[in-house]
């Protein structure tokens, strides 16, 4: 019988929070606040033999920064990865409130970092269709530059128009 705790693993989708976000939201509680610190997750990694993990942004700068800025989100992701080099990696964030040129410039700077594996797009959190023109240009840039794009989708059939439905994703 295989002991699951001893098998080496990669956790491909985790959410952690920077200390200032945790501190500012302590009274609200919730799993991201109560267990979202890097130290908490490193203990889990050690306990369950997780060799590396990929920190995912939310595409919502209000979740990973106190100044609600995607550049601060990236710095927070880098700081978290730096607490466990070669164990914690991350995906770049995107904030569609920025114009497309600014977004591409930010991404070009960020993907040069060794801890960045690619870009995460969470269309539901941005409330913008995954097959919309803004993302279309981001996908063109990513394809041209051989950048991995992770699309977060949880289809919801009760919606008339789901921005991250498989039908929309296949259009990308």
Set out the residue ranges of the language-model regions:
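Generic structural signal for hydrophobic
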Residues: 44-45, 110, 142, 172
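Structural recognition of alpha->loop->beta junctions
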Residues: 112-117, 166-172
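Active-site gating/metal-coordination segments in enzymes
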Residues: 67-160
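Alpha-helical scaffolding within the catalytic cores
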Residues: 35-44, 71-78, 104-106, 166-170
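An N-terminally biased module of ancient metal coordination in phosphate/nucleic-acid-related enzymes
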Residues: 1-68, 72
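Short secondary-structure boundary/capping segments
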Residues: 1-2, 6, 80-81, 172
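Histidine/acidic-residue-rich catalytic or RNA/ligand-binding cores of hydrolases
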Residues: 20-26, 160-169
